[in-house]
Swiss-Prot record:
Protein name: Decapping nuclease RAI1
Residues holding substrate: E217, K239, Q263
GO biological process: mRNA processing; NAD-cap decapping; nuclear-transcribed mRNA catabolic process
Subunit: Interacts with RAT1; the interaction is direct, stabilizes RAT1 protein structure and stimulates its exoribonuclease activity. The interaction also stimulates RAI1 pyrophosphohydrolase activity, probably by recruiting it to mRNA substrates.
Keywords: Hydrolase, Metal-binding, mRNA processing, Nuclease, Nucleotide-binding, Nucleus, RNA-binding
UniProt: a divalent metal cation binding residues: E168, D219, E237, L238
Gene name for this UniProt entry: RAI1
Length: 384
């Protein structure tokens, strides 16, 4: 019998017990589609002195030279870099990592957001494989031509998209400040930008009884990097948005801040830095928030968002519990892989098993759409 289950978005768990996030490893992803395990060459360092804000920084400067890496060949949703990092970690420990779900932060954020946003603004189209007692969740790659900035660089959407990357480039350095030549500092506004170079942190966390391993892109180090395995307390999230001038603007920003809070609290990033721009995409001000203060800001400023953060955590607990209860995860059968489709429609998360005659089945179960062959072999070798 084919497995099928659904969960209404109003469902809430009684638990709000979150596990303390811990960084287990990291990797760098290159713009030419490479994965560098335990490499921090793509890690950036925050540097945006107040005097820079007086220089009329243009967040559209260089948009025509922007290198868009979201192409057919570049799968931004692949788990392979995360799995390679996990494999290296397990080889050092000589044992399997005890978690129930392995995925990216963006997937968990979208699943949480499904209780607050419509599917039009928060599309959920995921694939899950059950292997070796664990669930691996991947987002279905969208058509690059639909999401690419190359479609129309003059559109408001494309300019807003680019301005976020530009803000990151203006606010960060590729090395700690003492190691950066003055000429490099002065040329920062002219730096050509791409969205393929990424630094990804591998974090173990969870809620209730569910243990989760999450890959999360890190924007920058805020202060300094320790020579240790866990630098979560030093990371910062960078965002750029329009200035807040009206009550309507404030409520719009609060909704954005809630989503940013979700991103950060999931993996234990404590600092959020927002750049505010005018309608001409000139950077005007920068404001810092601690992740822990965001729920209080939302509660005090917007009556409609008084309980939204606690609500989000209870929904997080509900859908992870539902996934673990619904999908069989046999620990003693390393040779069986089963695949599932997870979508969001009509106010429900819907889970359906993918049968062997489905066109997706072969790549999901026998191919490398989610699990790499090397990772599957490693888990088999671990049992010998």
């Amino acid at each position: 019998m084919v497995l099928s289950s659904s969960l209404f978005v109003q469902k809430r768990s009684t638990t709000t017990a979150l596990k303390q996030p811990k960084e287990l490893g990291h990797y760098s992803r290159t713009q030419d589609n490479g994965f560098l395990v335990n490499d921090d060459s793509r890690l950036a360092y925050y540097y945006l002195p107040d005097t820079d804000l007086d220089k009329k920084l243009d967040l559209l400067s260089g948009i025509k030279k922007f290198k868009e890496c979201n192409t057919e060949e570049f799968d931004s949703t692949t788990l392979h870099g995360l799995l390679s990092t996990l494999e290296e970690y397990e080889r050092r420990k000589s044992k399997k990592t005890k978690v129930d779900i392995i995925t990216f932060r963006g997937i968990i954020r979208k699943l949480i957001s499904s209780a607050f946003d419509s599917s039009q603004f928060n599309p959920v189209n995921f694939r899950i494989v059950s292997f070796d007692g664990q669930l691996f969740i991947k987002e279905v790659k969208t058509d690059a031509s639909e999401t690419s900035i190359n479609k129309n660089r003059e559109s408001l959407q494309a300019r807003a998209y680019y301005s976020g990357y530009k803000f990151e480039a203006l606010a960060t350095l590729s090395l700690p400040l003492p190691l950066v030549p003055r000429t490099t500092l002065e040329k920062r506004p002219k730096k050509i930008i791409n969205n393929g170079d990424q630094f990804i942190s591998m974090v173990r966390t969870g809620i209730g009884k569910c243990k989760i391993l999450i890959g999360a892109e890190v924007d920058c180090i805020f202060d300094f990097k320790e020579d240790s395995d866990d630098n979560l307390k030093h990371y910062a999230e960078l965002k750029c948005t329009t200035m807040v001038n009206t009550v309507s603007d404030a409520h719009k920003f609060e909704r954005k801040l809630f989503k940013t809070w979700l991103q950060c609290f999931l993996v234990g990033i404590n600092r959020i830095i927002y750049g505010f721009r005018d309608d001409n995409f000139m950077l005007k001000t920068v404001e810092e928030f601690t992740t822990s203060e965001v729920p209080l800001i939302l509660k005090n400023n917007n009556p409609q968002m008084q309980t939204v953060c606690v609500d989000a955590i209870k929904w997080y607990g509900a859908f992870t519990e539902w996934l673990l209860t619904s999908i069989p995860r046999p620990e003693d059968d390393i040779d069986t892989i089963k695949a599932y489709k997870l979508i969001f429609e009509n106010n429900h998360l819907k889970l359906t098993e993918i049968e062997s005659d489905d066109e997706e089945y072969k790549q999901l179960v026998e191919g490398e759409e989610i699990l790499s062959n090397s990772f599957k072999q490693w888990r088999k070798d671990l049992r010998k």
